[in-house]
Amino acid sequence: MITKRIIPCLDVKNGRVVKGVNFTGLQDMADPVEMARYYNASGADELVFYDITASFEGRALFTDILTRVASEIFIPLTVGGGVNTLDDFDRVLKCGADKVSVNSGALRDPGLIPAAAKRYGDQCVVLSADVKRVDGQFRVFAKGGREDTGRDALEWIKWCVDNGAGEVCLNSIDTDGVRNGFDLEMLDAVAARVNVPIIASGGAGKKEDFLELFHHKGIDAGLAAGIFHQKLLTIRELKEYLNENGVEMRL
């Protein structure tokens, strides 16, 4: 049995960790360096760091904060936000990231994914897709969930995987921050089309949501923010619960 992963996510804006609902109404949560240190000691399998307004504001990612975060942790770090070129990949990796998440940059220039996979290996390239239902179709959104690209999400994700994305982080805008469970319909639709690891993001509210998630084929990791940041659920408590219920975890 493949060990499943629990991944906390730091959404960073203006140097602070924030959290909202459905990608809006962002509230200040904490200092990202302190929070990274906490998760490193709390049993997280990996950490995701998103500079969530870099693409929308058309600027480079905050590398100073990223460097400090990377220096504090000893678990794999995935970083995204404002990644538009191979130079951006270089910059992020030199700051200490293990994997680079690309979203709006790939939508603008799809060739970025095969080029990055060729240079760094597909295990380094994570496709982050912000997906929402529009008129019964799963659609890809850009610029932090602000812009409907009109692209079919399932087709886009499959193309990216076929062209070098080694992992998919699927962010459901519909369930983001709502805490009623992961978007299993969307996750199943993607898992049926690709054969790379899938990280489920958006909707976690309780430990049972993760158990239900991991009963679905093709889902390798559960990502959450608010419930961990607010300590409504600790990662150790969650992993012990999952392990007791037949889901193999690294304890």
Predicted regions mapped to residue ranges:
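Active-site-adjacent beta->alpha loops and helix N-cap segments on the catalytic face
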Residues: I2, I6, A54-A70, N84-D90, ...
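Catalytic cores of alpha/beta
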Residues: I73, L77-K99, E185-A221
